[in-house]
């Protein structure tokens, strides 16, 4: 991070933030309750030691629960996800714990049977979370204007397997005709990507104040539409 960025983050103790961004990110997943019975899975012993094999998911060494996510689990080690049949079967989704916080924000909202619009949905992590919350009587419209990213979104939705998600590729303004039809509208708008700093070293070099301003303008446009 630049000196200017550290200054801008002084309220959050810029030096500590920089150190956190340099640290190895924890590995977390969100279990698919329709395929795993997530509520019955162990969250790891009190000592924080991993559970080598957890309720039919042998590739996952579960270290503990994500506090704000019913189905979220931290892993003690990062497995080879691409070699795990359970990953490809949609038994879980690899998702940062911070991204799972949206489920906590919806705890006071009646989501069972709800109609939910995920306006900027790819790659689908939050979409699958909404699908689990909405249940079989609900509907999630997962929208992504980029067709390449929408293809990835559709693949992840198919793997999750809840059968209550429709993938669309509309401009936000096209969905404006459905005013007051959705019970929940979620907008994970395009952002400047600081959250990628820990995972992708190239992300730091691609960051710029110009990109931040461009993203802010796009966010404002999406909300107005």
Give the location of each predicted region:
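S-adenosylmethionine
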Residues: 1-225
């Amino acid at each position: 991070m630049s000196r200017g960025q550290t200054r801008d983050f002084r309220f959050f103790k810029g030096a500590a933030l920089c150190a956190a961004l340099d640290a190895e990110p924890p590995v977390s997943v969100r279990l698919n309750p329709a395929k795993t019975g997530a509520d019955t899975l162990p969250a790891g012993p009190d000592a924080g030691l991993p559970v080598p094999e957890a309720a039919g998911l042998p590739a996952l060494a579960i270290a503990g629960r994500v506090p704000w996510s019913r189905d979220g689990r931290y892993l003690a080690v990062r497995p080879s996800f691409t070699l795990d049949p359970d990953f490809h079967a949609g038994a879980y989704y690899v998702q940062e714990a911070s991204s799972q916080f949206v489920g906590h924000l919806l705890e006071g909202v009646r989501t069972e049977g709800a109609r939910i619009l995920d306006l900027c949905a790819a790659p689908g992590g939050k979409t699958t979370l909404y699908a689990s919350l909405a249940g079989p009587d609900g509907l999630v419209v997962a929208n992504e204007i980029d067709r390449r990213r929408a293809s990835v979104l559709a693949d992840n939705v198919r793997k999750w397997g809840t059968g209550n998600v429709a993938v669309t590729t509309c401009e936000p303004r096209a969905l404006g005709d459905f005013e007051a039809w959705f019970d929940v509208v979620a907008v994970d708008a395009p952002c400047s990507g600081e959250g990628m700093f820990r995972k992708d070293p190239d992300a730091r070099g691609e960051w710029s104040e110009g990109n931040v301003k461009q993203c802010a303008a796009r966010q404002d446009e999406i909300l107005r539409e």
